[in-house]
């Protein structure tokens, strides 16, 4: 009988950090599920590149703020591949993406529905099958903005990221009996073309002045923390901070 390949589900993996983490886990031998909500072409492109490099990847659409959709996603993965072994809650709402017609309340609900509710729903479904998948991993992707918010517009984003730390500790305690570890990855600013395009070169350089190392991190530098969390068997309920000193620089 062919040995079952372990499955890693990365939410919000159609671009940026999520796509990078998908590539890294595929490189470790996981069958990677590239989750996305809207960008079909981008997600399919990420999965295709992983397959071209010899990895195993499949793009799957699911709005993780939709409970029935999340239940259906995990049930499908259980039926097709024997379940999920590694869950990476990476999906978020970009704090700079607020539409002009969104009221404060609408924006709050929008950000938390994906960044917090979505992570909770995915953790909850992972837990439903936990007894059958011992030695699993959950990694919740937070941000240094959880402890160092920078502007009024980011209140909802920072709040959602801080709440993930509590979610991590709660599930770490609940799932330890199944040898499942749950940790938080908290990156600082990441240098991506999309980010620099949005804030401009001047804005990017100004942000870098508030990082002790004087630069933003790369997606691969952040993904190093994910690899560690996935490979380590004895760390749970903890936070891996990778921010170049952004949390304490002036």
Language-model region placement:
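A glycine/serine/threonine-rich, flexible loop-to-helix segment
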Residues: 153-155, 173, 177, 184-211, ...
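C-terminal substrate-recognition "lid" of short-chain dehydrogenase/reductases
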Residues: 215-242, 247
């Amino acid at each position: 009988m062919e040995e079952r390949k372990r499955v890693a589900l990365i939410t919000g993996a159609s671009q940026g950090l999520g796509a990078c983490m998908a590539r890294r886990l595929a490189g470790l031998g996981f069958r990677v599920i590239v989750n996305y909500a809207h960008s079909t072409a981008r997600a399919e492109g990420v999965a295709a590149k992983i397959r071209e490099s010899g990895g195993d990847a499949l793009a799957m659409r699911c709005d993780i703020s939709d409970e029935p959709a999340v239940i259906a996603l995990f049930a499908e993965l259980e039926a097709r591949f024997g379940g999920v072994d590694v869950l990476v809650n990476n999906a978020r709402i970009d704090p700079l993406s607020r539409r002009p017609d969104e009221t404060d309340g609408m924006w709050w609900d929008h950000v938390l529905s994906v960044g917090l509710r979505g992570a909770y729903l995915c953790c909850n479904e992972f837990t439903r099958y936990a007894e059958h998948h011992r030695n699993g991993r959950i990694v919740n992707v937070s941000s240094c903005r959880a402890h160092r918010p920078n502007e009024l517009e980011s209140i909802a984003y920072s709040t959602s990221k801080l709440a993930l730390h509590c979610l991590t500790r709660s599930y770490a305690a609940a799932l330890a009996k199944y040898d499942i570890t749950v940790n938080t990855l908290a990156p600082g600013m990441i240098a991506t073309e999309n980010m620099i395009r949005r804030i401009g070169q001047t804005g990017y350089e100004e942000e870098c002045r508030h990082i002790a190392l004087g630069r933003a991190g790369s997606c691969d530098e952040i993904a190093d923390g994910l690899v560690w969390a996935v490979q380590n068997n004895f760390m749970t309920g903890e936070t891996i901070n990778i921010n170049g000193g952004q949390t304490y620089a002036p």
